[in-house]
Amino acid sequence: MTRIIAGAAGSLSLAVPRSGTRPTSDRVREAIFSALEARDAIDGSVVLDLYAGSGALGLESASRGAVEVVLVERAKPAADVCRRNADAVTRAIGRGAARIRVVVKPVAAYLETAPAGVDLAFIDPPYDLDEAAVARDLALLAPLLNAEALVVVERSARSPEPAWPSGIELERRRDYGETTLWWATTADPAADEPAADALAAAEPAADEPVA
């Protein structure tokens, strides 16, 4: 089991698929969401959780004020877990809960026909997914992003930097043991220095424990 860390559904336990997924650790999720909260990137946002697994990243966003969350997961058993978790989060939040959808499709197939207007996207594929597939996903995602949208890519620390398409620019990299987070944005980095500073201040160092 894992849990929602904070927000309207804080402390709610989430189911995880029995196999075939690699849930983001609580430590890494806390680091991600501390940084996102510091730059006010969640409240009122439209969120994509690609390779959703249990849906923990998207559902954490819903708990913290996102208005729409799409969980994309091709494996039906994992998608069924996403639905159960989404129902539990919706009940816990109650009135004003985000609109949460679960899409049972390969990520690329979803992105090819998805609507634009995304504020925040999580890409957390299996570590053994090849780099060409990650690059394809990013290229399909780019035209769907709003101005100053954020993209968080979780990969193995042994994986190379993703190939960023036109329209998405690397902001920073953070390492947490065997996990690397790549933060990227559609904004001009020179114009977004205060936000980048907030991210650096809020995010724990790679060797710093998260409370």
Question: How would you describe each model-predicted region?
Answer:
Residues 1-211:
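Class I S-adenosyl-L-methionine-dependent methyltransferase catalytic core
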